[in-house]
Structures are given as structure tokens and as C-alpha cells.
């Protein structure tokens, strides 16, 4: 396995995970199996799992690094998703 160039590849993987993790969490949310209050935690866990799975890709970091990156991406993805949905709720209909 190649050694990861810490800033470059990690940023690429985290960017991908920030986009993909909310998609998985939204799918989980639609099942209504998990209460909404737990979705941010689920997002972090999903990100960590996806990060762990990404260790099989070329140029990825160690398992610990990728789990850490995935968990951070999951947390960031949730924050980004919430920011846009709350903004849409607040400004969506009033701006027209």
C-alpha cells in the first residue's frame, strides 16, 4: 500500500465522504427505524464505516486515519445538510 500524502488524498476522500454520507443518512431517515434525534450520531457512524471501507482504495491512509476522516466527514456532512435544509425552511417561501 502506498503511503498517503496526508493533506492531498485525505482531503479528496473527506470531500467525497461529506457528499456521500448524507445520502446514506437520508435513506436511513426515510425508513423511520431510527428517531431523528439520533441521525447526527448515525451520520458520524456511517461516515466512519465508509471511511473504513475506503481503506481498500489506492492511496488511502491507515484504517485509523480513514475512520477518523470518515467520522469527521459524517459530522461535517450532517452540518452542511442541516444548514441547507434549515435555510430552505426559513427563506424558501418568504423570498417569493
Curated annotation (Swiss-Prot):
Main location: host cell
Membrane topology: Multi-pass membrane protein
Stretches assigned to the Periplasmic side: 56-60
GO terms for cellular component: host cell plasma membrane; membrane
Keywords: Cytolysis, Host cell inner membrane, Host cell lysis by virus, Host cell membrane, Host membrane, Membrane, Transmembrane, Transmembrane helix, Viral release from host cell
Keyword Membrane in annotation: yes
A single BP term in Gene Ontology: killing of cells of another organism
Residue ranges crossing the lipid bilayer per the database entry: 33-55, 61-81
Pfam families cross-referenced by the UniProt entry: Phage_holin_5_1 (PF06946)
Presence of keyword Transmembrane: yes
Cytoplasmic side: 1-32, 82-96
InterPro entries hit by this protein: Phage_A118_holin/antiholin
Subcellular location: Host cell inner membrane
Function: Isoform Antiholin: Counteracts the aggregation of the holin molecules and thus of pore formation.
Domain remark from Swiss-Prot or TrEMBL: Isoform Holin has 3 transmembrane regions whereas isoform Antiholin lacks the first transmembrane region.
Protein name: Antiholin
High-level lineage: Viruses, Duplodnaviria, Heunggongvirae, Uroviricota, Caudoviricetes
